[in-house]
Amino acid sequence: MIKQVEKNAKQKMEKVLEATKHDLNTVRTGRARPSLVENIMVDYYGTQTPIQQMAKVVAPEARQLVIEPWDKSVIESIEKAILKSNLGLNPSNDGNVIRINIPQLTEERRKELVKVAHEKAEKGRIAIRNIRREANDELKEMEKNSEISEDNYHRGLDMIQELTDTYIDKIDKMLEDKEQDIMEV
């Protein structure tokens, strides 16, 4: 029974880790990466749709992104969505594709982006801790209902804490890598 609680917690923590990784990938660095804009939502005939589902996004150069929509009529909608995304990007379109030149980041902007990355990582840590709390509550309930012994309860708490520490360390490592990426000139 404890193994099941641990397994459930691990699955949930894995999902949080993936979501945090995805969130951190949306934080801009000095290089052009398709992931920077792929998940920006665009109003596509009344439906919010991510850019990646309506266009091909490539980085032909280190500081340039090219977005080639499959339906040319949405070019202006994509352009507006990018401008509204607060990423500090200035798209330009030639009627067929949207080109985005990624400007060099200033020191001040880098520090702002590091703060944003810290906030996203902290959200991930909080989610991991909430999963730990849920698992601990589940174990406490099992012990209260005499489904597990007190020793097994404490063993379970220790396992969940180890799991929590492992996943928080993974998030910290991702944050550290992202920070280095952002601060790299």
UniProtKB/Swiss-Prot annotation:
Keywords (alphabetical) are:
Cytoplasm, Protein biosynthesis
For this UniProt entry, the molecular function terms from Gene Ontology, in alphabetical order, are: ribosomal large subunit binding
Q: Which GO terms describe its cellular component?
A: cytoplasm
The primary location reported for this protein is cytoplasm
Annotated membrane-spanning segments are none
- In the UniProt record, does the keyword Cytoplasm occur? yes
Q: Name one GO biological process term.
A: translational termination
Which CDD domains does the entry mention? Answer: RRF (cd00520)
- Superkingdom classification of source: Bacteria
The UniProt entry, under PANTHER family, shows:
MITOCHONDRIAL RIBOSOME RECYCLING FACTOR PSEUDO 1, RIBOSOME RECYCLING FACTOR
The family this protein is said to belong to: Belongs to the RRF family.
What role does it play? Responsible for the release of ribosomes from messenger RNA at the termination of protein biosynthesis. May increase the efficiency of translation by recycling ribosomes from one round of translation to another.
Please give the NCBIfam families that the UniProt record associates with this protein.
frr (TIGR00496)
Please identify the protein, giving its name as recorded: Ribosome-recycling factor
